[in-house]
Design a protein with these regions (language model features):
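DNA major-groove recognition helix of helix-turn-helix/homeodomain DNA-binding modules
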Residues: 43-58
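Alpha-solenoid helical repeat architecture
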Residues: 64-72, 101-110, 144-151, 181-192, ...
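Charged, helix-prone or intrinsically disordered regulatory segments positioned adjacent to compact structured domains
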Residues: 55-129
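"A position-specific structural signal for the A-helix of alpha-solenoid helical repeats
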Residues: 5, 73, 109-117, 150-154, ...
Length: 286
């Protein structure tokens, strides 16, 4: 039942029941729906939302009707904090849970935790058999919805180069379908997730895959308020160039310019990424 949440949004705007339901349904039916006594057809609900100037995306976000998996607060705390012993303990607990119930969402959460550990320690704690299962799930995705894109992005450091590139290209080919949903959040998580994937490819010196993905992401038409991703793509291109020719001046100049613009957090992130790539280059003699 979610009619009462519609009622709250209607009243906030000073719209009467009569105004809201005119030409859509009877006032008595709207009243019963708003009091959670009956349900209404999907088309009726959409028309009522349109009448009070609320999109379906907004309603799903504001209401409790939107289905959200319940996440253990301990998992959220482990993901947010860089307390390695605590993170490892929660990760093992989550893996044990998945091994008992084989629930796909629990595997995604375990992979998310392992991804965080990989970022900190550069070690993959997800067992090989679970890695295989995880990628098998993504390889069978036909419609890359927000659910799957988020799950892939939250575990992207756990995959090998071919897997990162293959799934990333599937997502990019699905862009037009995602745009039909009219939500820029999908574009945001795509750009963020695949940028992480490109960084992972660069760190493995898989520059051909990385270059192809940068080229494809640059083709995506972004709304103005997401144009900051063009800066990240520029950074990633300079990172690729650095790995090829060892000239660090262009990438350090860009980081300095970002800092001069007052974007200290982003500049620090870029610098940390560069230091990691530099260490990788030295370690593996790329």
């Amino acid at each position: 039942m979610y009619g009462h949440e519609f009622k709250e949004l209607r009243l906030e705007q000073g719209i009467t029941q009569k105004e809201a339901c005119r030409g859509i349904c009877s006032e008595s039916k709207l009243s019963r729906w708003e009091n959670d006594q009956v349900e209404v057809e999907f088309s009726t609900a959409m028309n009522l939302l349109n009448r009070i100037h609320i999109t379906s995306h907004e309603f799903m976000g504001w209401s409790k009707f939107s289905p959200r998996p319940e996440i253990d607060p301990e998992l959220s705390e482990a993901i947010e904090k860089e307390n390695i012993p605590f993170l490892k303990r929660v990760t093992q607990k989550q893996l044990t849970k998945y091994h008992k119930n084989h629930n796909k969402f629990d595997l995604f959460m375990a992979a998310n935790l392992c991804n965080q550990l990989f970022i900190i320690e550069h070690k993959n704690y997800l067992p090989p058999i679970d890695q295989k299962k995880l990628f098998a799930i993504f390889s069978k995705v036909n419609l890359w919805s927000q659910y799957y894109i988020s799950a892939f992005g939250a575990s992207i450091f756990l995959f090998n180069p071919k897997q990162i590139y293959g799934s990333s290209m599937q997502i990019i080919r699905n862009i037009d379908r995602l745009k039909e949903a009219e939500t820029s959040f999908n574009l945001e998580i795509i750009m963020g997730s695949l940028s992480d994937g490109i960084l992972r490819l660069i760190s493995l010196n898989e520059l051909s895959y990385a270059q192809k993905l940068v080229k494809e992401l640059k083709k995506i038409e972004l709304p103005q308020y997401l144009m900051f991703f063009t800066l990240t793509l520029t950074y990633l291109q300079k990172a690729i160039d650095y790995m090829k020719n060892s000239d660090d001046k262009p990438i350090l100049t860009l980081i300095s310019e970002v800092l001069d613009l007052g974007c200290s957090v982003q500049a620090t992130t870029y610098l940390d990424m560069f230091k990691y790539l530099k260490a990788q280059r030295k370690k593996y003699n790329f």
